[in-house]
Structure formats: structure tokens, C-alpha cells
């Protein structure tokens, strides 16, 4: 059975970091694709060891904050 999860990818220095907020897993890679593939593997391994109950997907939104330039 396949489940759909969210991946958030951002760059930190010379690496890309990928996170799955539903599960709490994270991984990294030298490219976006590598980080994403590593996250898929890490999440799959995690879920084999710690199966999760059905849950709602997190709300992903944006917000604005005043910043002094």
C-alpha cells in the first residue's frame, strides 16, 4: 500500500535538506533529487519500524511578519 506524504526541501550551505512533517523524518543530499530520494528511503524505513495510525494531513499555509530592513 502506498501513502502520500509531504516533503519540504530547503538548502543549507551546500546541501539540500528534505523533511516529512507528517512523520518527522528528515534527510539530506547534494541535490534536491538526492535529498528527496533519501527522505523517501528514510521515511519508508521508519514506517516499517514504527507504523502510524491514520491521521489528518497538516495544514500548510503562509504568514507575514514585519521585518525592519
Give names to the regions the model predicted.
Residues 1-8, 37-69:
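Short, charged, surface-exposed hinge/linker loops at domain edges
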Residues 3, 8-22:
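Short aromatic-glycine-(Arg/Gly/Cys) micro-motifs in beta-strand/loop hairpins
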Residues 17, 26, 64:
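Short aromatic/hydrophobic contact patches that present stacked aromatics
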Residues 18, 34-39:
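N-terminal start-of-chain detector that recognizes signal peptides
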Residues 23-32:
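A short, exposed loop/beta-hairpin motif centered on an aromatic-Gly-Thr core
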Amino acid at each position: 500500500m502506498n501513502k502520500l506524504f509531504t516533503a519540504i526541501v530547503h538548502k543549507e550551505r551546500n546541501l539540500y535538506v528534505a523533511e516529512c512533517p507528517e512523520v518527522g523524518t528528515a534527510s539530506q543530499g547534494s541535490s534536491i533529487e538526492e535529498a528527496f530520494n533519501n527522505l523517501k528511503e528514510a521515511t519508508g524505513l521508519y514506517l516499517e519500524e514504527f507504523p502510524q495510525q491514520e491521521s489528518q494531513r497538516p495544514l500548510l499555509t503562509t504568514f507575514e511578519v514585519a521585518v525592519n530592513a
